[in-house]
Amino acid sequence: FPTRRSSDLTALATSGTVYDLSLLDKVTDSQGKTLKEYGSSVVNQMSDVPDNVWNDIHEGMRRVVLTHEQFNGLGVTLSGKTGTAELDIYHPNHGLFIGYTTSSDTSEPEYSIAVRIANGYTSGNACLTANDILKYIYNLADEDTILTGYASSDTSNTSND
């Protein structure tokens, strides 16, 4: 699920450029010598979508992030979408977040992220995880404060958000 959603999200972030999904950038040997590099390849361009529609999507996703306190003070330009998926009345909802960051220099997309927490109760918990991942990627916090070996405090244990 997360890799497929991340790929779809990249198409949104790039205003319609669909890339062949690759999980690897390169392979190196034990001395750091690059053995193989993997480039990205465009498989489709959604050119029939007007610019104003892309702008509305980007603005809407930016506003979603601004309404979630889990991202307050992150220091990274992030746009995203939250969600919950219900299984049944006997199990907690799955918590979901997809998002992308943009470069402060060029406003071009840098990273896409997809978090799914099975039976995670609320999307807020997925937002907390995404926040920690972004702090790690951008070196915004000491690794020891992010990777504690313990779960973060949940945002809510209600299954109806």
Walk through the language-model features, giving the residues of each.
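Intrinsically disordered, low-complexity repeat and linker tracts
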Residues: 143-161
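Active-site beta-strand/loop architecture of penicillin-binding DD-peptidases
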Residues: 4-44, 58-145
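Residue-level signal for protein termini and structural transition zones
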Residues: 52-55, 121, 155-161
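Long, compositionally biased intrinsically disordered regions
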Residues: 45-46, 52
